[in-house]
Regions:
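Short intrinsically disordered, low-complexity coil segments enriched in acidic
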Residues: 1-3, 81
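Glutamate identity and glutamate-enriched acidic tracts
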Residues: 8, 18, 45, 58, ...
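C-terminal binding/interaction regions
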Residues: 3-31, 39-40, 95-99, 103-138
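Active-site- and interface-proximal helix/loop "cap" or "latch" segments in soluble metabolic
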Residues: 56-62, 66-124
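Structured beta-strand/loop patches that form or line metal/cofactor-binding pockets in enzymes
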Residues: 22-70
Length: 138
């Protein structure tokens, strides 16, 4: 999967912050993670967006102490899905798995310097994919 081409007119681009546009145009952590510990694929049945998230964690005998050491994503979706997945991927590297639930929608929106209300579905999709990947850790 690769990011989709977003065919929006210039006026619609004005509703997004420079931070958002940077993450959309140059997504961080895009691609495959060969040595992943867990993978999740989630689908938004309303808009059709699909997001695949793969994570690798440091080994530790206590699950709650493990830290995310790498994350990669692939997205088929709108610009918001791509930008959100990119910013979430930056937010979680180095964090303990137990602390990930502390990241909420507002944190993601703030990291993007704002997001139109009509695009919040992308934040929900991104957080859901991450939570599902974490749930698949053994």
């Amino acid at each position: 999967m690769v990011p989709t081409v977003w065919n929006e007119d210039a006026d619609s681009m004005n509703q997004y912050s420079e931070t958002f546009l940077d993450h959309y145009r140059r997504p961080r952590n895009l691609g495959d993670l060969v040595d992943s510990d867990a993978v999740a694929i989630v689908h938004n049945e309303i808009c059709g967006d699909v997001l695949r998230v793969a994570i690798a964690v440091e080994p530790d005998t206590e699950a709650e102490r493990r830290r995310i050491i790498a994350i990669r994503f692939k997205a088929y979706g709108c610009a918001a899905t791509i930008a959100v997945a990119s910013v979430i991927s930056e937010m979680v590297v180095g964090k303990r798995v137990a602390d990930i639930d502390g990241i909420d929608n507002d944190d993601v929106v703030a990291a993007l310097d704002g997001l139109p209300a009509g695009r919040i579905h992308a934040v929900v999709l991104g957080r859901t994919a991450l939570r599902e990947a974490i749930a698949r850790l053994s």
